[in-house]
Amino acid sequence: MTIIALGINHKTAPVELREKVAFSPEQISEALQQLSGHAHFNEAVIVSTCNRTEVYCSLAQQNSQTLLQWLSSFHGLDEHELSKNIYCHEGSDAINHLMRVACGLDSLVLGEPQILGQIKQAYNSAKTHNAVGVTFDRLFQKTFSVAKQVRTETNIGASAVSVAYAAVNLAKHIYGKLDKTNVLLIGAGETIELVAKHLYQNEPQNITVANRTLERARSLADQVSGDVIALAQLPERLHKADIVISSTASTLPIIGKGVVEQALKQRRYKPMLFIDIAVPRDIESQVGELDDAYLYSVDDLQTIVSENMSAREEAAEQAEVIITERTKEFLMWIRSLDSVDLIRHYRNDVQTIKSELVERAVSQLNTGKDAEKVILELANKLTNRLMHAPTRAIQDAAKKGEVAQLNQLKKMLGIDQE
């Protein structure tokens, strides 16, 4: 038996191709049914996200070409063209790859935790469709355990590595808990949307979104149970904010020193935190000269992100060591499975010999034959029958001069020669 991981991701293919290979929830259901009923595949799990699509299969024999043929056929794509952007891992490499993916080591953002939840969802879906057997059940449970160990024993997810996340972390560092803070977000683009999501998880007292287009502001505010104001209302509402985070596409500053001075006066000079992650800047640099206004720019955050990325890369090296060790452990378990059938077959053969000879001995005893002679005959015949195969193996190895084979047979038979 072998395990194969066939996939495509942000490193190997553009989004236009990744879209074509992605599986919708309905398609995953159909695909798992096809793979489960396929003659070559024993088990299957399909992981499909915006950045990657991966099919994990266990097969009786190595046959990655069959899996590629199935994938291209399922999506109606040219097999040759698809193969240019596909990667394939087999055996220990496939196991190692799965564990690396689950730990976020193969993600666009190093160490991101979302992929683990997506793999768990893929595994549960495969179980629901009876596409997971003993091997994959053990493999994926082991993978989840490894991901937890990496999170616990390294700092892979401890530091912010996006500007949006760093902005929220900076606010937390300064204020501690954010549950008593009022936050003003200026803009409604992708970066501010990410900031809003990170903020919402920290449960600030209030989030207000200010934007030139109120419709976009409302769409974002609805996601975080926030309020909406127009940009023109900033001068009259600024004093209510403890934290201001801005990221618009404006070519000129939106907040000047004078407006902030007025807001601080209305707040009785209670400090304000300004985080400007726009390029060009939304907040005049002179704001940082005010005693009770603390201004951080996108460059400040990029420095934090760069330092944190270095820390994550160091943690990733520690994670690789853990993953390598756990891959070896799983391979040992796989190999132990290969011995189970052999042991069962050998035991059945011995039991057959025993039953045959015991039945003959009992028959002889029933005819009145001397019991001692019957027992001796039984012992001799049982010994000869059990010794026949290893004796032949020893003789053959000796004739061929296979010293290593002879030593292996001695070890197997427990023969200790001085």
Curated annotation (Swiss-Prot):
InterPro entries: 4pyrrol_synth_GluRdtase, 4pyrrol_synth_GluRdtase_dimer, 4pyrrol_synth_GluRdtase_N, GluRdtase_CS, GluRdtase_dimer_dom_sf, GluRdtase_N_sf, NAD(P)-bd_dom_sf, Shikm_DH/Glu-tRNA_Rdtase
Marked site: Important for activity: H97
Reaction catalysed by this enzyme: (S)-4-amino-5-oxopentanoate + tRNA(Glu) + NADP(+) = L-glutamyl-tRNA(Glu) + NADPH + H(+)
Pathway membership, UniProt: Porphyrin-containing compound metabolism; protoporphyrin-IX biosynthesis; 5-aminolevulinate from L-glutamyl-tRNA(Glu): step 1/2
Pfam families on file: GlutR_dimer, GlutR_N, Shikimate_DH
Complexes and interactors: Homodimer.
Entry's family note: Belongs to the glutamyl-tRNA reductase family.
Other remarks in the entry: During catalysis, the active site Cys acts as a nucleophile attacking the alpha-carbonyl group of tRNA-bound glutamate with the formation of a thioester intermediate between enzyme and glutamate, and the concomitant release of tRNA(Glu). The thioester intermediate is finally reduced by direct hydride transfer from NADPH, to form the product GSA.
Cited function: Catalyzes the NADPH-dependent reduction of glutamyl-tRNA(Glu) to glutamate 1-semialdehyde (GSA).
Descriptive protein name: Glutamyl-tRNA reductase
Organism from which the protein derives: Pseudoalteromonas translucida (strain TAC 125)
